[in-house]
């Protein structure tokens, strides 16, 4: 009997969609699910044909966090530490991936699922989406989710989420800065593809450099940040993508031709 894959991948015009595929368990991040995502991300990092990644969930939810049954079944300290290190590696990989990652969110995104949304570079949600760092309700402060959440939300809003575990709707998530856009459920596919297509139309080399700089400089003091940004600009100017883009502007062409880059 063929086993249903935990992660689905589809590729179209430089856009890769990864879909968490355990709908009967609300796409929980079991060890096996995280291993599947990690393998896919590692492969994508080396795939120059991929310009944008979309991360989605199958079924009624985006992701309901970790698999609590699996955690309780193997709750010794060594296993728990390994689980959260595995999760942390996956989250860091999302940030270090050369390609931008867009979370496509519907239904609930709770605990590590909310972390996943926060860790992605961009996020678009349907208006039926809900978000929570809900571990506090079962006696677990969402420590690893807090790393991503506190880097996306203002301090007071982040603390409210982390200390109450209460759900917020998509509108409030937008106001908090957790997501970029809210749309009707029937428009979610189009909204995500529209954003992905805009990004995919740009040159991948300078997008990758820009993403790397974005995350690196925000952890630095202002002088070091400007120094790194200056070097990135110099490197960017030497790319053929920049030469084509600037020449297209000077030639008054509608768009640069980055199709073969």
Task: List where the protein language model places each region.
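Charged catalytic carboxylate motif
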Residues: 32, 36, 86, 93, ...
């Amino acid at each position: 009997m063929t086993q249903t894959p935990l992660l689905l991948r589809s590729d179209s015009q430089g856009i890769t969609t990864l879909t968490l595929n355990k709908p009967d368990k609300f796409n929980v991040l079991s060890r096996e699910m995280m291993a599947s995502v990690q393998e896919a991300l590692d492969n994508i990092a080396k795939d120059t044909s991929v310009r944008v990644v979309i991360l989605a969930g199958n079924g009624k939810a985006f992701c309901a966090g970790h698999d609590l049954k699996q955690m309780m079944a193997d709750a010794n300290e060594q296993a728990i530490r390994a689980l959260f290190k595995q999760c942390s590696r996956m989250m860091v990989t999302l940030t270090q991936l050369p390609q931008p990652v867009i979370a496509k969110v519907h239904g609930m995104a709770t605990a590590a699922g909310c972390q996943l949304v926060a860790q992605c570079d961009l996020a678009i949600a349907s208006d039926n989406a809900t978000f929570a760092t809900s571990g506090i309700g079962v006696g677990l402060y969402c420590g690893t989710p807090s790393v991503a959440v506190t880097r996306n939300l203002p301090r007071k809003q982040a603390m409210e989420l982390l200390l109450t575990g209460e759900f917020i709707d998509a509108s409030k998530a937008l106001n908090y800065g957790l997501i970029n856009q809210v749309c009707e459920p029937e428009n979610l596919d189009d909204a995500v593809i529209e954003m992905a297509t805009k990004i995919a139309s740009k040159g991948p080399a300078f997008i990758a450099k820009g993403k790397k700089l974005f995350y690196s400089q925000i952890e630095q003091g202002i002088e070091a940040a400007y120094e790194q940004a200056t070097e990135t600009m110099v490197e960017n100017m030497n790319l053929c993508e920049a030469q084509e883009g600037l020449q297209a502007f000077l030639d008054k062409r509608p768009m640069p031709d980055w199709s073969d880059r």
